[in-house]
Amino acid sequence: MSDLYDKTRQSWEDIWAEASVDIEFEVLDQKRTQETLGVYPAYLSKEGIILEAGCGLATVLMKLRAMGFTVIGLDYAERALHTARAYEPALDLQVGDVHALPYADNSLHGYLSFGVLEHFEHGIIPGLREANRVLVPGGTLVLTIPYPNVVHRLVRLKRRLRGQSVLTDDDFYESTYTQHQLIAALEQTGFDVALCVPTSHSYTLWGLGGPFRAKGYYRTSRLADALGAVLRVVAPWPFNFTTMLIGRKVRHVGR
């Protein structure tokens, strides 16, 4: 792996060191999170195992477990897993790489990835191929990836004018993808796309700061929530913060 991969990994260790499970639960209760959490569970099966690859503090897994799903989690940030286990010892969590999952072919019924695969220089295809490998035929993939929205483009322009990298910095890598790129990537890696929707428009506004931010951990203001609801209707893609895709495995690709 590259030096940037290792630096990004360390950045996540530092991020999780400053976070807490209780605060992450507050994020899950925010309206913008319900745009995803209120939708994708209906596509998951309670008959098999659901993996969250890149689970962080595992609050999503705790929510799904309470809903009756059988869940496991994996992350390369050990500190986050230690914190999650201390909060909920019964969780099945494992340290590992999303590109080399320690699970057999065709063994899992669901694969969740929330804001993970965009952090790798080599793109999202290797991670999607590995997701395909471990899913059973007909298994469900749930994926969220940042979108190159209006605010993101403004930030890129600002960085370019300052002579900085437009995508990342020296310690943390992140990329964005259009809905067309994501659909093509899923189809290339053996998935049929069941759903592709823009989400979290209020959080795009949060990126502008000022009146769009409320006190608290990444909280959007009432103004951001109200305008975000309007933008979701009148300009769904230009102000999309993160695209949610749900796919079904229709052919086995593997690594």
Protein language model annotation of sequence segments:
Residues 22-26, 76, 121-130, 134, ...:
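S-adenosyl-L-methionine-dependent methyltransferase catalytic module, highlighting the catalytic core
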Residues 1-100, 104, 110-114, 128, ...:
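Conserved N-terminal segment of class I S-adenosyl-L-methionine
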